[in-house]
Every structure is written in C-alpha cells, then in structure tokens.
C-alpha cells in the first residue's frame, strides 16, 4: 500500500524515529515554568488528562511531538528544489520551503532577535485581554472593514507595523462594494470579545473539531452547495457535473493541504520552536526587562506595558496574604480555565492574574497542540487552500461575494459560554478567510506573530504549485504509468535499494543501447528526466540520485520491466 512507502512510518503507527524534546514537560496546572532549559525550543506539556484530536481521553499524559519528521513524507507537487537538508545529533531533517529561523531570545549575542521574541509573545497575552464579552469595544466584522490585505511583511522587524499590539487585528481595510451585487457590504457591529472568541474557536483544532485541512474541505463543500455557484473549472467553459467537480476539487485541494502539512511540519520539526504558554510563563519567571531600577529586573524578562503587563505592588489584590507575590509580574488577560466550572454557563472573563498562571484560550485538557509552534500549521494550510480555491473556481470571492458562518448566542462556544449575541463570520474572499484564520491562532494563545507570516507565504507557494500540477492531470499534460506489465526474462536489478539521497545507484540488466530508454517515474506516474544523471560502464548503469527528493519511484525499462526504487 502507498501509505507503507510514503515516508510517514505507517508501519510503526507514525511513531517518531529519532526526534526527542530537549525540554522537560511543563506542569501546566502548577505556577510558572521551572523545568524549561532552553527558551527557544519546544516544551511538552504534562496534563492531568489529555483529550486528543479525536476526542480520546488519555489519563496522566504528556503528549509527544506529533510528526516532527514529516519532512520525510513524499510530497504532491513539491520537489528537491523546494527542499534543504539539515542534521542534528546525527539525524537528518528534510525541510521544505525553509523560511529561516524564528526570533530567538539571546540577550548577549542577539539583542534585536530577543526584542522581537519578547514583543511577539507579549502580544499574545495582550490580545487575550480582548476575550471578554464585557469588553466595551464594538467592531465591524463585515467585509466592509476586515480583509483585503495585498502584501505581507518580509522581515520580523516589520511585524510591529502589521499587527496592532493593543487593539488587535491587522492593516486590512476591507472592501466597500460586493462585486457580485454591486452594492456596499453592510456593517455588522459586534463586541470584540465575542468576535475574538468565536474566531478562535471556529478555527480551533482541539478535541472533536475539524483539523485545519478539514475546515477547508468543509468550506469547499459550502461553496459547492451554494445555489449561485456554477461548477466551472477555473471559472471557464461548461458547467461540470457534480461528480467531476468533486473529484477534481477534492484531488487538487488534497494535494495542496498535503504539501502544506509536509512543509509546515518539516519546519516545526527542525526549528522546534517554543509555544506561548511556555514562553510567557518563562519570561515572567525571569522578571521584567523594561526598567533596571524597578523590582524583578532581568534582561530576559517580559516587557512591561501599562494596563497590560505590570508588577504586583504592596496592597495589590494579587500581593498574597504575606506579600509573597509583591514584585512578580501580573497580566491583564484572559483569566483561564480555573474561573470556569461549567463551560455552558460560565465565562472566565478578563482581569489581572499572576503571569505565572497564564493559559491560552483553550480547554485545560488540551491547552496547546502537541508540536512546535513555528510555523503555524493553520496559516500554512489555510493560505494553501485559499490559493487553491481561488484558482479552481476562477474567482477570489466566495459565491455571491461573501461566505457566511453563523455563531448563535450562547450556543457556539465550547471553552466557555457564548457568544453573548448572534454573530456571523463573514469573508469576501478565500484569502480573507485565511488571513482571519491566522489571526485566530494569536487570539487563541497558540501562536505569536513570528509563527504566522512565514506560514502564509509557504502556504501561498504550496497552493499555487499544487494546483499547477493538478491542472496538468486534468488537461492531460502528463506522462502517466497506467500499468506495470509482467515480462519474463531478466528484470532490472537495483543496488543499493533503498539508496541514500546523493549516492550512486547501480542498475543491472540494461544493455548499453537501452540506456537512453530507462525512464524514472514518481508515484503519481509523472516522468522524471534523469538522462543527465545516468552514466554507463562495464554493463552497469550508474544513476546519481543527488537531484531526487526522498521518496518512492518506479524505474522502467523499454520492455516494461519495472522495479520500485526508494530514495532515503
């Protein structure tokens, strides 16, 4: 079966073969983060009970990193040109669409990177101060006011101009007119506390919810079911039948999110970057880094921000009975699951808490996905899917100029009660939906900005490339292996097989005159040009595998004799 050959380690139930976390687990229910040894690397979480993606309860669990070696999986449209190879502790990591490292905290050698690290993770806590229905700020969440972002910052130093530190959101100005109707998009004014919570939970990938690629298949189904939508491939030509449309759309979207997963998780596994719950607690444990003349100063501490990040002083309600908390860092933020007894009736709200007790806006049985943060899988998946949807429908806009998803009052949120009133998530374009998905992970306390933008850029490339390849299948511009004939006589002999990437493969039982007629195919049936990599001497063909991405291939002689080749 293909799944046993695609590099996913299906035979061993997808277990990690060599990755090990460098940090000891964080006991999330306990204050602070005393077990973190490297504040730039991922930290497992120790939970009283963990409920996994499928809703299975695992008592007393510290979930392992999910798929840090996913760069070994055979991609759909990506190839060796998209890949770099790194080595750590003698183990190989294949990285697709490598964006380079995230900001690291190292005040001695990299004060600029340290400042970006501290700014980004502090922003996550500040945005969590919006997660309260009692928040008096009212925002317009219609396409009239959100979306329509044309460019992304290319450097971490430019992120402060893209993300609004105190107000939340991005520079998107929205669109005045719905192109499908020719009239302006009507305003939709709702409490920011409701919008941010609904957005975070709509796109969440916790227990009993869809994964990010699953969200986009649901969106594809939503689009396909709209009465005003015409199933024209690329928006052109005749209307396709339901079955043909579904096959093409599912095939192409599957290829896009498959490559997005490989790219994102290859980066996660290599850079192994820390999550906000670990970083925020660790920084606050160091102290504050804003004023050397104030209490608890430490260059690695969290920056102070009036009304959001402050020090506990004498007489503060958080000072403690014996003043034991005076000088500690406090945060004005979402107060966490300790303030929720019944999620159907309770709201944690926002207020001052000790920073050592900070939680992301998630359930205490999940807290944070069990894998590294950089880059955001949601950002990568969603941008890849948005590009694919734009290309396959021939229109960047949802049918009718807007996609709508309703959240009913007190009947949508799962982490706590809410929203406090009905609201409708509205996006004009697929890219607008993708961009809001990315922001949802910051409001949810799962990612800092550093995880986001590079994921979007990687997904953008992956989505376009996946559609380009899928289109070749649809229009017939591919050389396909449709069958593997059974021939008698001497079959091809390959050694070594598997072969390590970059090594020479010896191919026996090929006559000198037949060398030009040996063809290599990937498992999609697409021919790969290896003529320049083949030499012939002493009755043996030598194939240099340097240009081949790791994966499974079919090597075929002119008479149809075919052998499977595995490149490691």
Show the residue positions of the predicted features.
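Acidic/polar surface patches and capping/hinge elements
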Residues: 1-480
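C-terminal outer-membrane/trafficking sorting elements
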Residues: 485-568
């Amino acid at each position: 079966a293909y799944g046993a050959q695609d590099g996913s380690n299906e035979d061993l139930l997808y277990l990690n073969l060599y990755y090990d976390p460098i940090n000891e687990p964080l006991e999330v229910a306990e204050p602070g983060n005393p077990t973190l040894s490297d504040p730039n690397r991922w930290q497992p979480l120790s939970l009283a009970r963990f409920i996994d993606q499928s809703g299975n309860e695992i008592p007393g669990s510290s979930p392992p990193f999910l798929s840090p070696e996913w760069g070994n999986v055979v991609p759909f449209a990506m190839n060796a040109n998209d890949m770099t190879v790194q080595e750590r502790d003698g183990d190989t990591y294949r990285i697709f669409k490598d964006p380079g490292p995230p900001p690291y905290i190292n005040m001695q050698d990299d004060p600029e990177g340290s400042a970006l690290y501290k700014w980004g993770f502090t922003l996550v806590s500040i945005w969590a101060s919006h997660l309260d229905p009692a928040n008096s700020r009212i925002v317009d969440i219609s396409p009239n006011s959100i979306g329509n972002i044309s460019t992304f910052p290319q450097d971490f130093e430019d992120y402060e101009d893209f993300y609004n530190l105190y107000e939340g959101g991005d520079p998107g100005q929205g669109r005045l007119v719905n192109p499908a109707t020719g009239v302006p998009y009507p305003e939709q004014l709702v409490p920011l506390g409701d919008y941010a919570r609904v957005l975070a939970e709509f796109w969440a990938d916790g227990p009993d919810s869809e994964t990010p690629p699953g969200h986009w298949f649901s969106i594809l189904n939503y689009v396909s079911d709209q009465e005003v939508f015409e199933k024209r491939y690329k928006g052109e030509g005749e209307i396709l039948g339901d079955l043909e449309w579904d096959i093409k759309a599912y095939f192409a979207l599957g290829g896009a999110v498959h490559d997005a997963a490989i790219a994102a998780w290859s980066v996660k596994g290599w850079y192994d970057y820390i999550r906000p719950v670990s970083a925020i607690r660790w920084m606050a444990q160091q102290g504050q880094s804003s004023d050397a003349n104030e209490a608890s100063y430490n260059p690695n501490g969290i920056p102070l921000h009036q009304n959001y990040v402050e020090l506990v002083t004498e007489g503060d309600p958080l000072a403690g009975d014996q003043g034991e908390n005076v000088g500690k860092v406090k945060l004005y933020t979402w107060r966490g699951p300790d303030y929720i007894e019944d999620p159907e009736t309770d709201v944690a709200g926002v207020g001052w808490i000790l920073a050592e007790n900070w939680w992301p806006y998630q359930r205490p049985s999940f807290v944070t996905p069990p894998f590294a943060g950089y880059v955001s899988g949601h950002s990568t998946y969603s941008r890849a899917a948005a590009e694919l949807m734009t290309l396959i429908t021939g229109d960047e806009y949802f049918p009718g100029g807007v996609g709508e998803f309703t959240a009913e009052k007190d009947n949508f949120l799962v982490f706590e009660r809410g929203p406090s009133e009905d609201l409708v998530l509205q996006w004009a374009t697929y890219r607008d939906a993708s961009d809001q998905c990315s922001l949802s992970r910051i409001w949810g306390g799962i990612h800092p900005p550093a995880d986001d933008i590079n994921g979007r850029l990687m997904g953008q490339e992956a989505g376009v490339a996946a559609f380009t390849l899928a289109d070749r299948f649809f229009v017939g511009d591919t050389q396909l292996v449709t069958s593997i004939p059974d021939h008698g006589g001497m079959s091809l002999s390959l050694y070594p097989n598997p072969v390590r990437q970059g090594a020479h493969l010896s191919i026996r039982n090929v006559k000198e005159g037949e060398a030009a007629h040996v063809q290599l195919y990937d498992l999609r049936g697409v021919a790969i040009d290896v003529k320049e990599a083949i030499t012939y001497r002493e009755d043996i063909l030598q194939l240099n595998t340097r240009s081949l991405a790791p994966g499974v291939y079919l090597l075929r002689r002119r008479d149809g004799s075919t052998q499977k080749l595995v490149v490691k």
